[in-house]
């Protein structure tokens, strides 16, 4: 029916944000599911990092529409608005995450919001009708941006780009969070995200583009053991972007988060634990070790009036329900 290119070609708005012909090998892939608002008839989709990942010298400019959320007319594919989280991304943080859509109060009035704990460690509050930037705060450790300006554009800390010798920056190469889904509960009016406070030493190198081969322009190493960093499930206010409570996780987690109408939040850990928390307070309600890493997000469904919660761990799918 239609197709939208996440890198604009010659003569299209945004192509001038790519130096020379770098747009032709620019990346900006979409590899995580987006969201849809039926009232606005808009599709929201996050885009990937520009290429090569870490050496931005060969692609000077903001590199649109990489590291963006794009709002598209569902009937035509026409771009209605976009917001770029990390212009000229040189740390492979991208924006391939699931947009959270929330109808809640902001600054004294009901708004249609988009809530986004980005991999770059900043939490963004946007108006999803217009793309207007409303607020942004760090939700995980970060050392690359001093602040965001009135349009949400980062004010970068000097000397945080990758280098030949290596530059240590937070968040880590895996980000403050990643593809694992966050969740919003209208009951508690909180956003839940699996967060990670780490750092990476980022390097650059000269890579020649060869079709079908890796084209990264560098990489990264973790300067300290990963268990020396801090991971947590964090509950964030959609009005302020401030963390209201956190549930520490050790070791880190790559599992998605599920919040339910029973005011319970479910998550998992890399050492095999599946846990349930009170969504308002973060109090631990119960946990169980499933014997394999939990990388998936939980799901909930009902059969014959009974609610079940399911989670995959390893090659097994587990189902839980309350006793009669």
Give the residues covered by each predicted segment.
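Extracytoplasmic/lumenal domain signature
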Residues: 1-24, 39, 56-95, 102-110, ...
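Active-site cores of enzymes that catalyze phosphoryl transfer or operate on phosphate-rich substrates
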Residues: 35-41, 47
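Active-site core of glycosidic bond-cleaving carbohydrate-active enzymes
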Residues: 64, 115, 187-196, 250
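Short, well-ordered beta-to-alpha junction loops that form the rim of enzyme active sites
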Residues: 6, 47-49, 195-197
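Long, low-complexity segments enriched in small/aliphatic residues
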Residues: 35, 159, 165-200
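Short alpha-helical segments and helix-capping/turn motifs at coil-helix boundaries
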Residues: 27-32, 109-110, 121, 175-181
């Amino acid at each position: 029916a239609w197709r939208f290119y996440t890198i604009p070609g010659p003569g299209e708005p945004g192509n001038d944000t790519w130096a020379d012909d770098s747009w032709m090998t620019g990346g900006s892939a979409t590899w995580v599911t987006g969201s849809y608002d039926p009232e606005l008839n808009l599709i929201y989709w996050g885009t990937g990092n520009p290429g090569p990942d870490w050496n931005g010298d060969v692609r000077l400019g903001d590199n649109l529409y990489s590291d963006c959320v794009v709002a598209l007319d569902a009937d035509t594919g026409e771009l209605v608005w976009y917001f770029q989280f990390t212009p000229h991304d040189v740390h492979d943080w991208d924006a391939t995450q699931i947009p959270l859509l929330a109808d809640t109060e902001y600054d004294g009035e009901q708004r249609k919001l988009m809530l986004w704990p980005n991999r770059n460690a900043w939490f963004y509050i946007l108006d999803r009708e217009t793309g207007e930037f409303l607020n942004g705060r760090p939700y995980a450790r970060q050392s690359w941006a001093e602040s965001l300006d009135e349009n949400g554009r980062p004010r970068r800390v000097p000397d945080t780009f990758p280098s030949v010798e290596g530059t240590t920056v937070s968040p880590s190469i895996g980000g403050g969070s990643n593809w694992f889904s966050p969740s919003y509960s209208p009951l508690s009016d909180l956003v839940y995200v699996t967060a990670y406070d780490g750092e990476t030493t980022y390097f650059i190198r000269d890579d020649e583009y060869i079709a079908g081969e890796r084209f990264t322009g560098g990489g990264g190493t973790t300067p300290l053991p990963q268990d020396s960093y801090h991971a947590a499930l964090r509950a964030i206010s959609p009005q302020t972007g401030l963390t209201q409570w956190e549930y520490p996780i050790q070791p880190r987690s790559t599992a998605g988060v599920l919040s339910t109408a029973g005011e319970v939040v479910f998550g998992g850990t890399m050492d095999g634990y599946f846990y349930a928390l009170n969504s308002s307070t973060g109090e631990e309600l119960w946990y169980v070790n499933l014997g394999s890493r939990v990388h998936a997000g939980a799901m909930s469904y009902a059969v014959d009036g009974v609610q079940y919660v399911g989670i995959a761990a390893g090659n097994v799918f587990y189902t839980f329900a309350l006793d009669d």
